[in-house]
Amino acid sequence: MPNPPRTAAIIVAAGRGLRAGAGGPKQYRTLAGRPVIARALQPFCTHPEVFAVQPVTNPDDTAIFNDAVTGLNFRPAVGGGATRQGSVRAGLEALAELNPDIVLIHDAARPFVTPDLISRAIVAAGQTGAALPVVAINDTVKQINAEGCVEATPDRARLRIAQTPQAFRFDVILDAHRRAARDGRDDFTDDAAIAEWAGLTVSTFEGDAANMKLTTPDDFIREESRLTALLGDIRTGTGYDVHAFGDGDHVWLCGLKVPHNRGFLAHSDGDVGLHALVDAILGALADGDIGSHFPPTDPQWKGAASDKFLKYAVERVAARGGRIANLEVTMICERPKIGPLREAMRARIAEITGLPVSRIAVKATTSERLGFTGREEGIAATASATIRLPWGAEGLAG
């Protein structure tokens, strides 16, 4: 085996996760503002020793999967099977053309895997060919019978809780999965059990107590509180934008195409509301302004839709491990009237940012017929953004 070995990863995300509640697969729920599946994928996608990441998903989830993992680099997802075992086999078969030396198999419902744990998995598989991370059991364990009565008290010193990523030589675990399928065995709950059944010696290495699997609603409540408490660097930014009227029959405001007797004079679509929000978010990040990221001298932004700019700003927050707590924009104009459009604007901003509409405010005022807005020569907008970042997240994402 080469050193370092060619390592690929399979992220199993085809389950329905109904025990977690919320009416949908748990891997697509957000945790501290970010989808669980994105949290699980990113450490593998960015690990320097992992050259290929293969997601396995339910084909019915294609749209929500694509929305959840924007910006991550991985192989096209393949459809899973009727069981976790079948889904892993589908991922292994998809990787067969690459023939990696080692494969890491990880559950998407474990979003707290660390680069260090991934590195330990690669080393362990290189040494023994089959290995899984484990953590000790601190509580006394009881074995009970069908009536709920205690039958035995196992020695907890020899018991461990299994985690993922489980790591294997690719050829041996692929062969074990194929043999199990031929023999009609589809009842294994993890890949180490298949390796054991196939006669392989499975070693263990130190896991991580924080690398827990999200299963129940209480798991989400607890981890949401823990992650939010870590985001103690609370920042506020402000933004301002203005555009003059020119010829046209509509204006773009807060992501909506609004009929009007004038248009905007602008390099992009001139959406003053979204531009002000972008500057507010970038200001909270101390990350320049909209002009430094999208220069008006660059022809690629000519006529560009401003929702692209706002999505980019939101991604900058996520790249720093943060979340947006609140967005507020105030439109300053005589016409068009903002009141009838307010709720549609809030909904559109929520759609662009992925935030609940309850965290978005759209307000309107006039300048009492004073100044350029009072003379109906253009529209102005002010905005504020409150974000939460983890302490020590000063470095900008590339």
UniProtKB/Swiss-Prot annotation:
SUPFAM superfamilies: IpsF-like (SSF69765), Nucleotide-diphospho-sugar transferases (SSF53448). GO terms for biological process: isopentenyl diphosphate biosynthetic process, methylerythritol 4-phosphate pathway; terpenoid biosynthetic process. CDD domains: CDP-ME_synthetase (cd02516), MECDP_synthase (cd00554). It holds the Pfam family YgbB. Gene3D superfamilies: 2-C-methyl-D-erythritol 2,4-cyclodiphosphate synthase (3.30.1330.50), Spore Coat Polysaccharide Biosynthesis Protein SpsA, Chain A (3.90.550.10). Pathway: Isoprenoid biosynthesis; isopentenyl diphosphate biosynthesis via DXP pathway; isopentenyl diphosphate from 1-deoxy-D-xylulose 5-phosphate: step 2/6; Isoprenoid biosynthesis; isopentenyl diphosphate biosynthesis via DXP pathway; isopentenyl diphosphate from 1-deoxy-D-xylulose 5-phosphate: step 4/6. 4-CDP-2-C-methyl-D-erythritol 2-phosphate binds at D241, V242, H243, H267, S268, D289, I290, G291, T365, T366, S367, E368, F372, R375. The record marks R19, K26, H267, T366 as: Transition state stabilizer. Its cofactor is a divalent metal cation. Keywords: Isoprene biosynthesis, Lyase, Metal-binding, Multifunctional enzyme, Nucleotidyltransferase, Transferase. Its EC number is 2.7.7.60, 4.6.1.12. The record marks R156, K213 as: Positions MEP for the nucleophilic attack. It catalyses: 2-C-methyl-D-erythritol 4-phosphate + CTP + H(+) = 4-CDP-2-C-methyl-D-erythritol + diphosphate; 4-CDP-2-C-methyl-D-erythritol 2-phosphate = 2-C-methyl-D-erythritol 2,4-cyclic diphosphate + CMP. A divalent metal cation binds at D241, H243, H275. One of its GO terms (molecular function) is 2-C-methyl-D-erythritol 4-phosphate cytidylyltransferase activity. Residues 1-234 are annotated as: 2-C-methyl-D-erythritol 4-phosphate cytidylyltransferase. Residues 235-398 are annotated as: 2-C-methyl-D-erythritol 2,4-cyclodiphosphate synthase. NCBIfam families: ispD, ispF, PRK09382.1. In the N-terminal section; belongs to the IspD/TarI cytidylyltransferase family. IspD subfamily. Bifunctional enzyme that catalyzes the formation of 4-diphosphocytidyl-2-C-methyl-D-erythritol from CTP and 2-C-methyl-D-erythritol 4-phosphate (MEP) (IspD), and catalyzes the conversion of 4-diphosphocytidyl-2-C-methyl-D-erythritol 2-phosphate (CDP-ME2P) to 2-C-methyl-D-erythritol 2,4-cyclodiphosphate (ME-CPP) with a corresponding release of cytidine 5-monophosphate (CMP) (IspF). This is Bifunctional enzyme IspD/IspF. It comes from Rhodopseudomonas palustris (strain BisB5).
